[in-house]
């Protein structure tokens, strides 16, 4: 679109409107699905939850890194005992505690609000028949199910089930010219959040044992014996 408009000698609003109308007439652009209000609200819940989660993890990593400079190693602790472990390390160093305490307060608030959003997410999934059905698939949890529900939005807009993979950006790119014909990696043109959830679900399926002789981290064919 921009290349066509720049090709015009005279740049005016009338010429721009005429150029855009001509491009629409050619038929190179496809209509875009506008998500429903419910889908947009679900996406907002998922993005806000992810934002709080990433900020809380960033604070944890920052505290681990800065305390390591002073010779303190936090070690392997869960989210519930993280603050107690930090307080234990700096309780006898007042000048260091003054610098660390603000981050602990912010982390505490982030974790509290993250829990509220997560419980809200679980309540929505619990009352949604489609999400409960999706969770019967191995590796699919509440977050993946709700992300899929919000991304697909209106299933009737897909003529075939194979088209869903293209919307997620999980189909292979194609390059063909003369005798050259090869398929590249996935296009990654679709929804980034859904694609990330799909990869997590795939790793969860590959990481579990599927009967005798199966090793963790190796995917088995659905029709394989055993």
Name what the model sees in each region.
Residues 1-226:
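A detector of single, family-specific signature residues
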């Amino acid at each position: 679109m921009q290349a066509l408009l720049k090709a015009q000698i005279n740049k005016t609003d009338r010429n721009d409107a005429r150029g855009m109308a001509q491009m629409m007439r050619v038929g190179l652009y496809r209509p875009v699905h506008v998500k429903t209000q419910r889908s947009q609200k679900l996406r907002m819940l998922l993005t806000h939850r992810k934002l709080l989660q990433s900020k809380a993890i960033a604070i944890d990593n920052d505290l681990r890194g800065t305390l390591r400079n002073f010779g303190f190693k936090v070690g392997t602790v869960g989210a519930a005992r993280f603050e107690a472990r930090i307080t234990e390390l700096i309780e006898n160093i007042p000048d260091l505690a003054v610098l660390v305490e603000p981050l602990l307060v912010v982390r505490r608030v982030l974790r509290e609000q993250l829990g509220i959003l997560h419980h809200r997410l679980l309540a929505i999934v619990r009352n949604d028949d489609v999400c409960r059905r999706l969770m019967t698939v191995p590796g699919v949890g509440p977050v993946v199910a709700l992300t899929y529900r919000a991304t697909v939005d209106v299933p009737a807009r897909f003529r075939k089930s194979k088209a869903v993979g293209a919307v997620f950006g999980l189909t292979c790119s194609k390059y063909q010219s003369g005798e050259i014909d090869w398929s590249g990696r996935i296009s990654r043109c679709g929804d980034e959040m859904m694609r990330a959830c799909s990869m997590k679900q795939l790793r969860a399926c590959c990481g579990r044992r599927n009967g005798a002789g199966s090793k963790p981290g190796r995917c088995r064919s659905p029709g394989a014996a055993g």
